């Protein structure tokens, strides 16, 4: 969905979006998403994290931001799916309600994943980093929740932070060293030193 949006925005070719095979693909994606939606909360479950490693809790903030963005794109380009705009806003609200936690000092941050029973984790993966949320248009780079999130995952005491190293980036268990994808994220987000 995001690739279709980028293609249409870059080329102005919206006719492509209405080819039968593309519309069928969009319908298939929406059907699969519907299977992963929580019955009462507009969050979508995932089994794997961006690295293809198994997740801890079922509702990943980053993945739900992608769902939010994808649903907005569908509503924008497909008149038969304009109702997805309301679902996108429900996802946005659910992320802000359920995926924002507070640290020991009371500062709000985006959790990596949550389970809706109060559990969450502080974590990040360069292939789908929380640092990218402003690039997806989900929040402003000056958003205090975003700023606190970035500060947490780049802090020297975060297990996969390499702050103070020659390449002061983020890793994860999948790649337990400063990952080049993290460097790319930092360049995109203005965090590179």
Where are these regions (language model features)?
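Extended ligand-binding clefts on enzyme/binding-domain cores
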Residues: 20, 24-46, 57-69, 81-180
């Amino acid at each position: 969905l995001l690739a279709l949006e980028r293609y249409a925005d870059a080329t102005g070719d919206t006719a492509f979006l209405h080819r039968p095979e593309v519309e069928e693909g969009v319908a298939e994606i929406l059907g699969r998403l519907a299977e992963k939606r929580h019955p009462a909360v507009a969050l979508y479950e995932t089994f794997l994290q961006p690295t293809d490693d198994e997740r801890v809790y079922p509702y990943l903030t980053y993945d739900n931001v992608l769902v939010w963005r994808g649903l907005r794109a569908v509503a924008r380009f497909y008149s038969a799916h304009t109702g997805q705009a309301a679902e996108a806003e429900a996802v946005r609200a659910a992320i802000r309600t359920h995926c924002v936690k507070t640290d020991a000092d009371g500062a709000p941050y985006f959790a990596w994943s949550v389970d809706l029973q109060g559990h969450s984790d502080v974590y990040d993966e360069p292939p789908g980093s929380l640092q990218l949320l402003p690039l997806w248009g989900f929040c402003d780079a000056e958003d205090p929740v975003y700023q606190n999130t970035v500060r947490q995952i780049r802090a020297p005491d975060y297990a996969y932070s390499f702050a103070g190293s020659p390449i002061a980036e983020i890793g994860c268990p999948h790649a337990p060293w400063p990952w080049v994808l993290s460097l790319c994220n930092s360049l995109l987000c203005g965090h590179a030193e």
